[in-house]
Each structure stands twice: as structure tokens, then as C-alpha cells.
């Protein structure tokens, strides 16, 4: 055994043994060999960007610790891995480097896989998938065709968010402050045909399940999904009009529909606002250049509800009027930049007295404000509007003719009934959720399996012709989708209906399609006949999913929808894919910067600067080591290449080892909390592992005596010190086991540190009982450390003979707490005289009251305090204290 801990030798040796033994290959156990059943734990699959970052290390270590612990507990545990391999970064890298995206992607996969293996992760690589592989995306295409058959997938032309730099459609969620989430380009609005999935058909079930069937998810994530789905119950009704188009036909059949959750305020309508794309807006703009210019301006504005809520409210009058359905009054129609055509009917009623947004708009343009709700029975001035609006309490109708005096619900019911009687409205439930547009005008994605025929239009590709394979030789040049001009992609394509020459669809699928079901493919990755089969029945639903909070809405919502579609198609038997969800915290590091010579911001690596502290030790600034000049300290932020505050896991592993990287990321903060990087703490983790190794070396040197004790069957009695060691070890073991169950890995690590401290503080008197206690206790430490630092634990387990006695650590059971070891031979009780603390008294564990009284009365502390005075009364509180009254 090496005297010094050499992490490179230890880790390479362990990994070589695991790979040779195919140690982590898992099968569906139906024999009962795994008494606790199956457990499926999975991290969100990474994008193969080139290198792992510390966020990856933290995520995968959390998963790996859970996996190894549960295997020791008797579970059949699956931990797979794959690659979310389609997407824009590969195209951009191809343009930059002049190589096909496929080559760039597969090179990155190979490198990142080596990094994962260097981390010692217990991944079953036999189940590896890459979403850019035709054997995988064939099933994207197959399910898309099934959705077409069922009417879940459909084609339509709609106003969409267009990123002019990436030349593609963006979902609302991908537009931030009016700009593309990736390029930062100002997003345009365009009418483009594309394919959509009816996720709205599942809105009620998606909402109900996230509210009531996912107790293992963080409340924050469940609330985010609930708000995104956005169920609203209200009334949809029409304002009538006589506005006609150029042909003389009534626009919209003479009705302009709106939806409101506050039908009780309908008598307070003083204007209506429509979206810039609304038919009435476009009709009015045809003869109004100023209005037309305003509509063009709106196209460059925000595209999400959140953005529209915060941007300045602007509008232009159309010169058109519609008729109020209950009063018959004429209501002016405006175009508002805060109205979305994609939500509801693209029109809203304006009730400025009772809606914050309408109030802001009306005040700006001098529109009438009519109060029709009285809160708490009091009349409020318009000047005090903000006070009572913010209260949001239900009130009674006023200034509302026949509805005066009705409470909110009664008023809504009455208004809805009157509108229904006129044939102009009805109660309705609406949803914030919109159908999922899956068409992307990009090359590197799953080809949509559609053929375009001049005679028959869009025709599905026959199932026997799947997969439609994406050409691998394209090198995007920024001039649009190269599939348009790729001759091989369209060569020989004929219409499945008439057999005439045709062309393939060149749009590809949103990459969120790829990540919506990969976790099911892990269960049966090599099946070329079925999308999923018996493996999914065994492993699904997933027991524990691990990933970032940034995926709370899009990925997790789409995955839930995809699962329900697969269920309805008879492919799986589950309603929800993920039983428990853990969203790990971000990894942060310090940020240092100063203005560069050319006016930009120059960022410095933390290793390049020296911190400046105030009297309290707080960092207030820094100076660059090379020139001594001051730099700004910006605090901590997410690690990123652009700010030079990242830490390369490969460098960390080479310098300190994978076990140190794993231990540090688990010890520094609970899994859900942010982790603030600290180089000194990394050193501390490494020192701890050296201490463990050094203790193992000491045990190895004494193994002759230990072997003698083993040969004797460890029948020797434990001495006092050995009993105390075992009591401490098993007490901490009990807590560590509990913390593993809670996935509180920071306290798991601190518990292991307590175990080592107890071992180091133990004085070995050379007796067989002492050797026995040491051998058992260090074995417990190694098994408790194994999920966090598997290489070190594996090496010491083998070197010290545990493997020869108990088998490989891979298959070792979790150590059981010995309840007998927790029992103490003697206990120490607090001694009080006349209620005041005077010392302590030691008695045998389980001593009766008479024995405790006798020991207390004979104690030196009592005799000194009593000074000969007799005891009048002795009060014993079992297990805690003795109080003697004199």
C-alpha cells in the first residue's frame, strides 16, 4: 500500500477495474434478487457543448451519491446518460470552424464522455443515447405522424416571433425584453406556416396533476407551471358592429369578441383595445398611415405577457366603434401595444376604473373612467384609485343599472345570463397556455416527416420510410437553412399519394421534442421495432429527476405533455414521468472587472487578483497581482467563460482528483442551495481525503494484530475505550443514514468527518477488542464515504482486506446500526443542590432510583456543598439530573 495518497493512481486503477467488470450495467430484475425493487435516478441530459462545467459536476455527483447509496440499500438502480445533441450552437460552431455540425457534436460527445468517466460516475453506458442519431429521432418522427393521425399535431399559419440573426422562430418563452434569448437580436413578428401540437387539449390534466399528484416536486416549480398553464374562468362575449371589408362583408361576422374574468365590471367599459394584428386594426390601418406606422412599431415590441405588463402602454385610435352588448352605447376601438393576438380573441374591453393596465392607458390618452364597483361599501375618488385597487377585495356593483347592489359572483352570473339570452356571450374557461409550435427553420434538428406535393399539398411520409435522415455533410453559412438547397435531401422524393416528384419539408423540430422523452428511451435504447417497450413498464415513472430550475417550465411541462400523449397512444401506462424532482443550486464564483483600454469591460480570473477587505473582513475591492492596479469586485455570480470566473473540472480533477471535486461540491452547500466557490475549501476537502488515506496506512501497518483478532473470530470483549468508539461511530452512522435518505449530502460529508475524528482520537491499547472495534469502524467509514468518494473508498477497502472478507465494495451492503453499541455502560447525570448546579454524578446505565440517590449522596460535589448538613429530600429525573434539598 502506498504511504502517500496519489489520487491519479487511485482513481485510474479503480476506474479501470469498474470498466473491465462492466460494473454499472443494469438489467430489469424480475427474479427478486434486489429485495427493495427498482429505483430510476436520472440527471437532465447535457448539451454536448465541448466540456463539462462545475454545474455538471455538481448535478452528476448528486445523482451518483444517490445511486451508490441506494444500491447498497438493496435497490436495482438505473443511472443512465445521453446527449441532447441537436441545436443552434452546433450550427454556429460549424460556421465558425467550417466543419459539419455532426462532426463537431460527436467530437464533443467523445470528450465529455471521457470527462464523466474520469469523475467515476456509476453510469450504465450501455443505455447511452444521442438525440442526433437517426435510431433515436426516427421515433420523434414516428410519434409526430401518430399525433397527426389523432389531430394532436396540425399545420397553421400564425404570427410568430422571428429572430433575424438565427433566422428561426422563437417561442414566447425564448424572447426576453423583445430580444432573442440567444442572439440578443430585436425580435420581429412574421406570419409563417408551421406545425403545432395541441398541448392545450391537456391543459386541465396538466394543471390538476401538478397541483395534486406531484408532492415530490418543489413547491416553487409546481407554482411556476401552474401559473404558466394559467387557468382563467370568466365570460366570452361580443361587441357588435357594422364594419365591413373592401368586399362589403362584415368583418368577423359583425362581432368583436373579448374575454374577461370580471364580467361584473362590464358596465364600466369606456373603450376597447385590439392587438396590432387584429382584423379591425388592419382594416383601419389600410386608410390611416399613422396607424399603419404604429402597427409596424408594435411588431418590434415585447411578445410575452410579462414584457407587455412592464413596457410603456401605447395606443392609437382606429376611428372605429363597436356597440356595447348591454347598454347599446358606442364604444371606441383603439389599437394597443399591450394586447396579444395570440391570447384569447386579440381584443380586450377597457375598464379603467377597475383594471391597472386600463387605468394607465386611459389616464395617458384622456379616456373616460367610470367606477362600477364599490369596495367595502365605500365610494372612492379616482385619485385614490391605486389604494383600493391594490386591496383587490370583492365589492358590490354600483352605477350598473339593474345590477346595482349585486356582489361579484352574483353580478357575473347575471351579466353572463343576459349576454347568453342575447346570443352574444357565455361563460368560458380560458388558458394562458398556448399550443406548442414545433417547426424551426434550422438544419441541425429532427426533419419533420412531411412531403410537399404541388397537387396534394403537405403529405405525411409513410411509416415504412422512416427515419427521414438528416444529411450529415451540411456546413451552414448563415444564409438560411441549407436543407432548402441540398439536392440529396430532395433527390428521388415523390408524393406518397400520386407518385409525382415532390420536395421534403425543410423545417426541423424544436429541440425540446428531443428532450421530452429521452428518459423513456433509456429504458429500452436498442429497440429498433418500438419506441418504448417492456423496459419502460419496469423503470417508469422515474423515481428521482435532477436538474436546474431554469427548466421548470419548458422542458418539464413538455415532458409531462409528451408522457400523456404516449399514454393515450397506448405506449406507456403512467400519467406523470417524474415522481420526485430536485433542482440543484447554481455554482457561483467571484467576478472582477475594470474598464479596458478600448472602453469595454475587461474581466479577470480570481487567481489574477488579490482581494481588499474592510475592517469586518468583507471584500470591498481587489487589485491585479501583475500590475497592482485596482479592479472592481462585482460580488459573486454564475460561473461563465465571458466573465473569466469559471473553474475547469478537468484542471481540478488532475490537480486534486475526482473524489476531491465530488466531496467539495457536496460538502459546501445543500444540493438545492447555491454553491459559492472557495479555493481554500477545495484544499480542505483534499486534506480530509489525505487524512483518511493516512489512517488507512496506519491500519495496514497494524494488520498483523488485526489479522490475529480476525482469526480469533473477533470474540474478544470490547474494552471501555472500544465501547465508546463503537457508540460514537454507530450514533453518527444513524445520522448519516438519515441524511442520505433526505439527500442532504453536505451533512453526510460532515458526518463522515466526525467518523474520522472519532477514529483518530481513539487510543489503540493493542487489545484484540480494540483491533476489532477499529476494523469495524473504519469499514463503516469507507462504506459511508463510498457514494461521495468511490475511488478512495474502493482502494482502501481492497488494501485493508475488507474485499477479501466481505466482497467488492460495489456489492457491499449498507452498514447496519448496532442498537447494542448505542447503549452506554454508565451515564452522567447533572447534580443540583437546592436547585443549583453543583457538578455531576456517574452511575451505571439503567441504575434504579436507590442506586442513583446513594451515588449522589456519596459524591464529592454534594459532600463539599452540604458541609455536613443532612439531605431533606432527593429528587431524581431519570436520565437527566439529581436534585438534593438540604
Swiss-Prot record:
Assigned keywords, A-Z: Aminoacyl-tRNA synthetase, ATP-binding, Cytoplasm, Ligase, Nucleotide-binding, Protein biosynthesis
Similarity remark: Belongs to the class-I aminoacyl-tRNA synthetase family.
Domain of life: Bacteria
Gene3D superfamilies: 2.20.28.290, 3.10.20.590, HUPs, Isoleucyl-tRNA Synthetase, Domain 1
EC number: 6.1.1.4
UniProt catalytic activity: tRNA(Leu) + L-leucine + ATP = L-leucyl-tRNA(Leu) + AMP + diphosphate
Residues annotated for ATP binding in this entry: 641
An annotated GO cellular component: cytosol
Protein name: Leucine--tRNA ligase
Any GO BP: leucyl-tRNA aminoacylation
Compartments (UniProt record): Cytoplasm
Amino acid at each position: 500500500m502506498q504511504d502517500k495518497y496519489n489520487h491519479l493512481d487511485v482513481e485510474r486503477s479503480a476506474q479501470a477495474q469498474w470498466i473491465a467488470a462492466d460494473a454499472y450495467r443494469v438489467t430489469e430484475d424480475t427474479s427478486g434478487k434486489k429485495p427493495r425493487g427498482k429505483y430510476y435516478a436520472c440527471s437532465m441530459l447535457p448539451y454536448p457543448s465541448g466540456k463539462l462545467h462545475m454545474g455538471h459536476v455538481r448535478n452528476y455527483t448528486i445523482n451518483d451519491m444517490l445511486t451508490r447509496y441506494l444500491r447498497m440499500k438493496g435497490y436495482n438502480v438505473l443511472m443512465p446518460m445521453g446527449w441532447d445533441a441537436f441545436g443552434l450552437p452546433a450550427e454556429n460552431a460549424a460556421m465558425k470552424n467550417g466543419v459539419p455540425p455532426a462532426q463537431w457534436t460527436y467530437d464533443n460527445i467523445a470528450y465529455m464522455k471521457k470527462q464523466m468517466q474520469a469523475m467515476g460516475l456509476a453510469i450504465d453506458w450501455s443505455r447511452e443515447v444521442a438525440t442526433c442519431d437517426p435510431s433515436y429521432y426516427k421515433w420523434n418522427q414516428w410519434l409526430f405522424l401518430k399525433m397527426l393521425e389523432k389531430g394532436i399535431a396540425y399545420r397553421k399559419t400564425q404570427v410568430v416571433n422571428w429572430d433575424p440573426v438565427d433566422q428561426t422562430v422563437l417561442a414566447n418563452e425564448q424572447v426576453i425584453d423583445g430580444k432573442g434569448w440567444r442572439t440578443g437580436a430585436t425580435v420581429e413578428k412574421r406570419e409563417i406556416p408551421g406545425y403545432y401540437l395541441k398541448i392545450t387539449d391537456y391543459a386541465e390534466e396538466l394543471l390538476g396533476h401538478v397541483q395534486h399528484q406531484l408532492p415530490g416536486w418543489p413547491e416553487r416549480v409546481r407554482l411556476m407551471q401552474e401559473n404558466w398553464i394559467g387557468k382563467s374562468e370568466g365570460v366570452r362575449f361580443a361587441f357588435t358592429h357594422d364594419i365591413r371589408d373592401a368586399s362589403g362583408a362584415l368583418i368577423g361576422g359583425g362581432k368583436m369578441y373579448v374575454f374577461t374574468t370580471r364580467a361584473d365590471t362590464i358596465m364600466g367599459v369606456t373603450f376597447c383595445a385590439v392587438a396590432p394584428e387584429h382584423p379591425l386594426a388592419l382594416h383601419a390601418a389600410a386608410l390611416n398611415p399613422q396607424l399603419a406606422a404604429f402597427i409596424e412599431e408594435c411588431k418590434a415590441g415585447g411578445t410575452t405577457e410579462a414584457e407587455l405588463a412592464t413596457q410603456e402602454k401605447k395606443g392609437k385610435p382606429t376611428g372605429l366603434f363597436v356597440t356595447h352588448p348591454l347598454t347599446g352605447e358606442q364604444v371606441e376601438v383603439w389599437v394597443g401595444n399591450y394586447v396579444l393576438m395570440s391570447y384569447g380573441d386579440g381584443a380586450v374591453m377597457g375598464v379603467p376604473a377597475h383594471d391597472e393596465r386600463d387605468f394607465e392607458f386611459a389616464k395617458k390618452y384622456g379616456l373616460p373612467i367610470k367606477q362600477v364597483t364599490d369596495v367595502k361599501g365605500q365610494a372612492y375618488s379616482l385619485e385614490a384609485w391605486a389604494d383600493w385597487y391594490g386591496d383587490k377585495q370583492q365589492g358590490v356593483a354600483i352605477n350598473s343599472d339593474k345590477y346595482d347592489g349585486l356582489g361579484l359572483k352574483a353580478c357575473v352570473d347575471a351579466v353572463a345570463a343576459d349576454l347568453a339570452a342575447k346570443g352574444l356571450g357565455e361563460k368560458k374557461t380560458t388558458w394562458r397556455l398556448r399550443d406548442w409550435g414545433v417547426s424551426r427553420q434550422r438544419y441541425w434538428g429532427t426533419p419533420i416527416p412531411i412531403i410537399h406535393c404541388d397537387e396534394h399539398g403537405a403529405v405525411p411520409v409513410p411509416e415504412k420510410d422512416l427515419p427521414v435522415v438528416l444529411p450529415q455533410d451540411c456546413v451552414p453559412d448563415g444564409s438560411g437553412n441549407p436543407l432548402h438547397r441540398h439536392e440529396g435531401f430532395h433527390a428521388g422524393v415523390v408524393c406518397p399519394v400520386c407518385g409525382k416528384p415532390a420536395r421534403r419539408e425543410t423545417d426541423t423540430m424544436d429541440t425540446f421534442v428531443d428532450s421530452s422523452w429521452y428518459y423513456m428511451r433509456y429504458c429500452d435504447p436498442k429497440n429498433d421495432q418500438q419506441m418504448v417497450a417492456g423496459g419502460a413498464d419496469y423503470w417508469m415513472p422515474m423515481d428521482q429527476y435532477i436538474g436546474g430550475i431554469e427548466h421548470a417550465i419548458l422542458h418539464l411541462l413538455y415532458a409531462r405533455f409528451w408522457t400523456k400523449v404516449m399514454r393515450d397512444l397506448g405506449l406507456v401506462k403512467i400519467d406523470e414521468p417524474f415522481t420526485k424532482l430536485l433542482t440543484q443550486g447554481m455554482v457561483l464564483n467571484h467576478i472582477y472587472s475594470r474598464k479596458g483600454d478600448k472602453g469595454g469591460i475587461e474581466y479577470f480570473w480570481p487567481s489574477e487578483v488579490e482581494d481588499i477587505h474592510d475592517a469586518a473582513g468583507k471584500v470591498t475591492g481587489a487589485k491585479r497581482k501583475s500590475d497592482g492596479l485596482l479592479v472592481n469586485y462585482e460580488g459573486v455570480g454564475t460561473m461563465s467563460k465571458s466573465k473569466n470566473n469559471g473553474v475547469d473540472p478537468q484542471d481540478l480533477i488532475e490537480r486534486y482528483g475526482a473524489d476531491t471535486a465530488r466531496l467539495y461540491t457536496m460538502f459546501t452547500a445543500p444540493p438545492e442551495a447555491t454553491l459559492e466557490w472557495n479555493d481554500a475549501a477545495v484544499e480542505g476537502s483534499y486534506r480530509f481525503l489525505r487524512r483518511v488515506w493516512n489512517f488507512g496506512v496506519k491500519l495496514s501497518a497494524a494488520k498483523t494484530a488485526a489479522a490475529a483478532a480476525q482469526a480469533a473470530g473477533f470474540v474478544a470483549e470490547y474494552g471501555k475505550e472500544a465501547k465508546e468508539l463503537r457508540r460514537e461511530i454507530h450514533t453518527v452512522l444513524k445520522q448519516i443514514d438519515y441524511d442520505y435518505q433526505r439527500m442532504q449530502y453536505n451533512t453526510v460529508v460532515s458526518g463522515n468527518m466526525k467518523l474520522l475524528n472519532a477514529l483518530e482520537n481513539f487510543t489503540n491499547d493493542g487489545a484484540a477488542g480494540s483491533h476489532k472495534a477499529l476494523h469495524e469502524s473504519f469499514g463503516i467509514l469507507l462504506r459511508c464515504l463510498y457514494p461521495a468518494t468511490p475511488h478512495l473508498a474502493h482502494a482502501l477497502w481492497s488494501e485493508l482486506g475488507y474485499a477479501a472478507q466481505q466482497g467488492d465494495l460495489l456489492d457491499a451492503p449498507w452498514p447496519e446500526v448496532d442498537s447494542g453499541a448505542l447503549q452506554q455502560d454508565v451515564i452522567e447525570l447533572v447534580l443540583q443542590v437546592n436547585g443549583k448546579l453543583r457538578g455531576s454524578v456517574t452511575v451505571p446505565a439503567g441504575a434504579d432510583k436507590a442506586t442513583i440517590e446513594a451515588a449522589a449522596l456519596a459524591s464529592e460535589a454534594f459532600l463539599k456543598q452540604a458541609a455536613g448538613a443532612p439531605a431533606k429530600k432527593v429528587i431524581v429525573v431519570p436520565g437527566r439530573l439529581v436534585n438534593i434539598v438540604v
